[in-house]
Amino acid sequence: MQNRRNTKTQMNRFYSNIHSILIAVCLLLTACSLPAFAQQGQATAAAAKSAEAASAALVTEFDVNGLKVLLKKRAGSQTVATGLFIRGGARNITKENAGIESLMLGAASEASANFPRERMRAELARMGTQIGSSVNYDYSALLLGSTRANFDRSWEIFTDAALRPTFKTEDVQLVQSRMISSLRDDTDDPDTYLQRLQERVAYAGHPYFNRPQGTAETVASFTPEDLRKYHQQTMQTSRLLLVIVGDLDAAQLKERIASTFGKLPRGDYKPQPVQQLSFSAPTLEVTQRGLPTNYIQGLFTAPPLTSDDIYPMRVASAILRDRLFEEVRVKRNLSYAPSAFLGSQAANIGGLYVTAVDANQTMRVMLGEISRLQHEQIDDDDVKSIVSQYLTDYYLGQETNAAQAGDLALYELVGGGWRNSFEVIEHLKAVKPADVQRVAQKYMRNIRFVVIGDPKSIDRNIFTTQAGE
């Protein structure tokens, strides 16, 4: 599960530096000029909205033969981040061809018609340019990172890799072997194995059940011809999204895109809503492993980014995370790293994670903290503190062009449109204690637990009793 430790911020959703500066300046002016608290609140809200508008105005949206393009201008930036995103994610694949999109993108970044593998590596190394790929349940991407000075040449290589990959046998086998080795190692590491087991339980009957990364068996079965066919059916502008962040001119960029990606066929791909997850009862699956501690994770359904509930849910998850750390680690020393987490998927999840020798006592405490969050009054100062910390992490994480490109893509593909990425802060500031309690009651229930460890040491009743009962 993505970002389960919550020691990381949620998947690349941040504002630009200019946004941060504008808010800080507006707040300072407000505090200095308005003596009344109510007036300060009104001015702060107005300043934030103005900052949102200013940041959104840096984004230019345009269409090239059905390809949607988002360009975020960052004047003076010395780097450029580019992502060619493929819509669909797990919905593009089946049990039989899971992993083909990941392998296709990986092999494409190895060699292309005009840049065989050795030449591509030499050129990229000379410029310090990076081309890579990424896949998740909702979309995948071919990614480019370069300096502004080397963007022109880097763009040539990137577009050639995207549009004219050679898929030579030796290149495909190289990427294949790396992927297979990684997939076969999944069961060696308890944390990784825990995620694989959790996915089988949580996503049964759902499109997410077919992992975009595939399995060792499926990845090993693909041939270069399979990749060529999949590439041909995927490279349609209706299936793609291009996001670029850097100090670039939109007019010049349009010409470059028209002469490259703009020549692709449109196709007729139409995104469909993702089926939401539904857990009707708490469950527990225990896998025997001779380990010094038990590895435990539990999932509950969570609101998607398009839901108004996502904002109080972020606060609720953060409060729970902090309370678990205090109660489980600091006060009782039951575990080194208890955590609560919240995802950013179209069919979203949240959950608990812990490693503990005394699994039963640890889970009593953790489920007790969920119950407390659901039923005891929450201090408004706690909510404000969490939001303030979130803002700090938010802005720090927004410092790179790659993070901003990822944020725009996430909200465009999963969050109801890229403009919503600029409204997160104000939505969070509007969260009240009652909202936090409400979403905790609504979503933090029917938890599906997976445990790796000693089945004899696990009290099933503790894990499957509903929080709050």
Regions found by a protein language model. Name each.
Residues 44, 120-230, 383-402:
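Acidic/histidine-enriched segments that form metal/cofactor-coordinating
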Residues 41-47, 204, 212, 237, ...:
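An aromatic/glycine/proline-enriched structural segment found at the starts
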Residues 178-197, 275-293, 330-334, 376-426, ...:
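Short acidic/His-enriched helical or mixed secondary-structure segments at domain edges of catalytic enzymes
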Residues 66, 84, 101-104, 124, ...:
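Buried hydrophobic packing residues in well-ordered domains
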Residues 83-148, 211, 319-332, 341:
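M16/MPP (pitrilysin/insulinase) zinc-metallopeptidase core fold and M16-derived inactive scaffolds
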Residues 20-33:
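Bacterial N-terminal signal peptides
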Residues 110-114, 145-176, 342-397, 464-469:
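M16/insulysin-pitrilysin zinc metalloprotease superfamily fold
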Residues 39-51, 241-246, 353, 384-469:
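C-terminal regions of mature proteins
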